[in-house]
Swiss-Prot record:
Gene3D superfamilies in alphabetical order: Haem-degrading domain
NCBIfam families, A to Z: PRK02487.1-5 (NF002696)
Lineage: Bacteria, Pseudomonadati, Pseudomonadota, Alphaproteobacteria, Hyphomicrobiales
Pfam families: HbpS-like
SUPFAM superfamilies: GlcG-like (SSF143744)
Protein name per its UniProtKB record: UPF0303 protein RL3365
Organism superkingdom: Bacteria
Length: 162
């Protein structure tokens, strides 16, 4: 797939993977689902679910290092700044030949890499982010999308990046 193909598919993901309502219980369920998927697959990842600026779920599975904590923070910052997935932001920067620094942001605080996805609520927009770190960026992104698709009973095959 080309960058444009990926950006188009991610835009569709962000549109389709939207909740009617999302609260602290839903946040916990999303984080727990990701933890279960990762454990079943033996994935060493960090998982974070944040509403606005409030962390509501965090898990670090075997294999995670302190670096993953920082990656989570930096990827999440991309979503909370631009209200789109960190992977989409990174692909757009790559397509345009730009960096986060070109947008006046610090690379120490913003990571335009896959793994953080907006938590969107219909009629409200982005209210937070779900973030995965520990895999290659495309896999981090796909795992977050998979969990959201499962929670929302959406067809993952039509949403997943190839």
């Amino acid at each position: 797939m080309t960058i444009d193909d990926d950006l188009s598919r991610i835009a569709e993901q962000e549109k389709v993977l939207s909740f009617d309502a999302f609260d602290l219980t839903t946040a916990w369920q999303l984080g727990k689902l990701l933890q279960e998927l990762a454990t079943e697959r033996g994935l060493g990842i960090a998982i974070d679910v944040t509403l606005h600026s409030m962390p509501v779920f965090y898990a670090a599975l075997p294999g995670v290092t302190p670096d993953n904590v920082n990656w989570v923070r930096r990827k999440r910052n991309m979503v909370l700044r631009y209200f789109r997935s960190s992977y989409a932001s990174g692909l757009k920067l790559q397509k345009d030949g730009k960096t986060v620094e070109d947008n006046g942001l610090s690379g120490a605080d913003y990571a335009p890499h896959g793994g953080s996805f907006p938590i969107n609520v219909k009629g409200s927009g982005c209210i937070g982010a779900v973030t995965v770190s520990g895999l290659p960026q495309r896999d981090d992104h796909n795992l977050a999308v998979e969990a959201l698709a499962l929670m929302l009973a959406k067809d993952l095959d039509t949403l997943r990046l190839a």
